[in-house]
Amino acid sequence: MTGKLTGFKAINTNTVTNKFCQKMNKTDSICGSCYSMAMLQGSRKNCQPAWQNNSEVLSQAPLTARQLPVINERFFRFHGHGELINRTHFENLCRIAEHNPATTFALWTKRRNLIRGDKPSNLILIYSNPTVDRVLSKPPKGFDKVFNNVAAPRTNENCTGQKCADCLECYRFEGSSVIIERVKIRH
């Protein structure tokens, strides 16, 4: 990954073909200025074929034991680019986490309807609040953290542009369960 995610590895999916992302990108939510949608249609266009393959493999059927990757990272991100496509997709990410118990995984999603039941103990679920300037003070049921975006500076911002690898607030179970970042608008 690059930018604030430098140093992290991730499994990404294709936002351009994700029906949820297509719909949300036409709203005034944070998705209306989605960095991934813009990058995959511009500077990261070359990533679309590989990430489309990930979208298909993760969402169409349960992964077999042979398909489960070995992740040799302390922290790993699901979806530096992408969003859950369906329940099968979520279950496959859980399978990957279960297969790699020494790694802490973090998954951001706006798809609360797909999160239910047990999850692996090494998976941090972060609700990605789609509404700018409506800070949720606690995570929804089933989530470990909530990630909020604000348009103007606030004294309680705790995601302030540093490198994620230097902070790790989102990648540790302890610490704040409420993350607040100022919006980075991309057009």
Question: What would you call each of these model-derived segments?
Answer:
Residues 1-187:
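Class I S-adenosyl-L-methionine
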